[in-house]
Amino acid sequence: MDYIDFLKNKMAISHNTGFDINDDELTPTLYPHVKDTVRWAIKGGCRAIFSSFGMQKTVTQLEILRLIVKHEKGKCLVVCPRRVVVEFETQAKEHLQLPVQYVRTMQEVEACQADIMVTNYERVRDGELGVRIDPQYFTCTSLDE
């Protein structure tokens, strides 16, 4: 076996587990690099996006979740540091005219009218009075930072 074959045997291939979207489903005002990232992530399914500061990661996440809700129905959850929650709410409204709601308990989750909810890591890890937000309730869960 030569070195190139050795390297090829070491490569892990990430298979697509998502779905295709049409270009007209994307929010038209998104930057081209955001549209490309959204298409790639939606088609791939389980994907991580490691974009630099200022590359609209929050908007990218929200657009991915919006399209997942459109195609798969159900609810989506963003789990992020508490200091980032307001950014998600603001970016969703400003760039996508999308309602996003902060939730603290499973009771709030179950009563929430928004398709996309945001909470902080402590609510999932520790909960409130021992009751944690259960990510399995959601069609999709997205982790930020």
Residue ranges of predicted features:
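SF2 helicase/translocase NTPase motor core
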Residues: 1-51, 55-145
